[in-house]
């Protein structure tokens, strides 16, 4: 009974967190949405505009990572596989690692750069090395989305950089987040990493919630001007996991 009570309190706190975050933000962003689900049962504990389409920003990289993990799982690549950097990838706007054209980056470093730094150049590197072009990789991402049950999502790039046709919903991102944790539990542990070092430079996580909320262990933050700040996150208490997604914050509350 005590554990059930503690879990009820946990659910209440998570739901309250989402309510406070959404309804204390500025009205400068019309599209606000959120969803909280129980990981084990997939029960929706709270939702607001969960099916409203919005720009995913860097939450896009969750799918880029999902596909990368899938390739690793199928032994099509290894953590030591070197990915070549093209001129197009090197030219991507920040956030980025400032990779140089013609250089390479190992898969294991690319994974951490996407999780911690949210590097747009690395996202394009992954896309081009898997599918030849980022356009083709985006088609692959959308195909994966449909197979996972993400019916309202269309990807146009691997990074989340602005594209009016790249759209998703809070519900779809919760489905993706659940699938990533379920299908790649060992890889998901990497999302709890708070910093990583690449070529002598240390990068720290953008996800401040992991530093302040007990039990939080991921997942991803995002921002573009057109949509505001976004967050997909997961937390565990008393061996119970919840997943939450927020869209359309006008400032970082976490």
Briefly describe each language-model feature range.
Residues 8-9, 55-57, 83-86, 203-207, ...:
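N-terminal start-of-chain detector that recognizes signal peptides
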Residues 14-22:
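Bacterial N-terminal signal peptides
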Residues 4-14:
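Bacterial N-terminal signal peptides that target proteins for export
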Residues 59, 253-254:
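Ser/Thr-glycine-rich phosphate-binding loops at phosphate-binding pockets of nucleotides
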Residues 150-154, 162-167, 171-252:
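Domain-terminus/edge residues, biased toward the C-terminal soluble/receptor-binding domains
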Residues 24-171, 180-181:
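Active-site-adjacent loops and short helices of periplasmic peptidoglycan-processing enzymes
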